[in-house]
Amino acid sequence: VTQDYSQPIISDELGSNSPHAAAERNCFARGVHTPALFEIDGNPIPALVADFGSPLFVFSEHTLRSKARHAREAFRRRYPKTSFAWSFKTNHLQSVCQILRQEGWIAEVVSDFEYEKARYLGFAGPDIVFNGPYKPRAILRRAIDEGALLHIDNWDELSLIEELTRDRREPLDVGIRVWLDAGIRPVWSKFGFALANGEAERAAERIVKNPRLRLHTLHTHIGTYILEPSAYRTATQKLLALRDTIQRKHGHLLDCLDLGGGFPSNSLLHGMAGPAEQVVPPIEAYADAITDVLNRLPEKKRPLLRLETGRHLVDEAGYLLTSVVAVKGIHRQRAENDGLSARDFKEQLIAGEDS
């Protein structure tokens, strides 16, 4: 008798399926000592709080640009045909988006608000990747008219796009979102057409046969804060296999593979089983996993690789400045701050005595 195998995960006694849950009681999970910080990009922290109050979010332009350039170099040195899209859902602050636009990123959006924000900030329609499980008719019509790249998520959306493009003279470039198992648990199941049951191939066939649409991209998004680079290798292999099937059956070679995001940062997550510097692989490990597969292809068959980076770029650039408003002696000395509603932040002594 056989049964489907499901990879085990660490779980606590309450039955949580979070891989980080058991780390709550791990003596290494509380992070490591960090020195006092007195300024951010040359701006004294007391002056920032005096000018803007607290709690206050501050982002380092220097760190953001450095992370972007490091990621770009890691991938393009291995695979020059790499394009990057900034995940607006991760952070849609105007300055953050503009900095990444200056660094050569296009926009990746998942809602009408994000699409309109990207256009307002100067991203042209063809420089916008439109993901998301739901795209209202009005914004879909606008995105089609402006030439955005639509990643189709479901059959209903495909039918709506077919309706909206019925009178087009030139085919519209589109992509399909592919749900696949890359070997990590839990498996995300909220995006796209399933690969294993042939749904993704059927969606591709329907698009290829429509003269008003042109299948440009295969897209997948396997999760967030992925600590196993090998999962991206598996995802790349599976998308390439689907691409080969489409070419073999329909004579159409797709231009682009979009591996989505999910790349972790070195910011410490609540309950992480060890310091981030020891747990999180370098971005080069993810670049190796993906590009090793692509570089095995004949040069003429190598697709454009697109990545939708988010937290990997911005996490370490962001700071939440708070002020101590009370000190209590309950059980042990505790300090309360004015950012009590904030969670999953690494506490750090700011503009005070090192301890």
Task: State the predicted function of each range.
Residues 67, 118, 131, 197-214, ...:
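Structured alpha-helical segments in the cores of large, soluble enzyme domains
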Residues 96-97, 120-121, 140-144, 161-164, ...:
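Short acidic, glycine/serine/threonine-rich loops at helix termini
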